[in-house]
Amino acid sequence: MTFQAHVVTLYPEMFPGVLGHSLAGRALERGIWSLNTVQIRDFALDKHHSVDDTPAGGGAGMVMRADVLVAAIDHCPPDLPRILLSPRGRPFNQAHARSLASDRGVVLVCGRFEGVDERVLQARKLEEISIGDYILSGGETAALVLLDALVRLLPGVMGNQASGECESFENGLLEHPHYTRPPVFEGLEIPLVLTSGHHKAIADWRQEQAEMLTQKRRPDLYAIYNKNRRKT
């Protein structure tokens, strides 16, 4: 079954963008996933194709209109998860990516300007998702990030499934360091254990390195990992 990605945006020309290349691009060509963009301005109600208006109560910037944006959203299948990319949303993570990738598709709504009329979220039950604690010019870049995370999890996209299972976050830890030829580079050697041929020793080293990196760089993740490990 083809995974359906619907993107509601003012800039459909931004898609597929980088997703037209590499793993995601090949998967798109093979029909593993499909991409449909909906131009919000096509649903404007005036001759100027206006999609925004001044904020109620005053303030800076402009707000995307509920009537226009809802009409654009309603152009997408109603039975798919609907997501608004927003800096105030729930932080996006690998577990959320796996959950969304297991569905039949997703509708991504890309905000612009100062924000979106709150009634859009209420009327169409949009979930707000954030890709980080920073501000972007619009939701399109965030939508590309989210789609990249989803598409690579779809069956048949990654050539080596084990590769995906060993990546950062898949087991609650950051990924261990990687090495390849040459054996010595500018005086830096590949750790001897990796060339020993001792598979258990290699696995133990990688696990130890992953735990050390996570504890140092992401103590928040390490605390969760430790808590879950104690339960098992």
From Swiss-Prot:
GO terms for molecular function: tRNA (guanine(37)-N1)-methyltransferase activity. S-adenosyl-L-methionine binds at residues 111, 131-136. It comes from the Bacteria. The keyword S-adenosyl-L-methionine applies. SUPFAM superfamilies: alpha/beta knot (SSF75217). It is an enzyme of class 2 (transferase). Disulfide bonds: none annotated. One of its GO terms (cellular component) is cytosol. Belongs to the RNA methyltransferase TrmD family. Specifically methylates guanosine-37 in various tRNAs. This is tRNA (guanine-N(1)-)-methyltransferase. It comes from Bartonella bacilliformis (strain ATCC 35685 / KC583 / Herrer 020/F12,63).
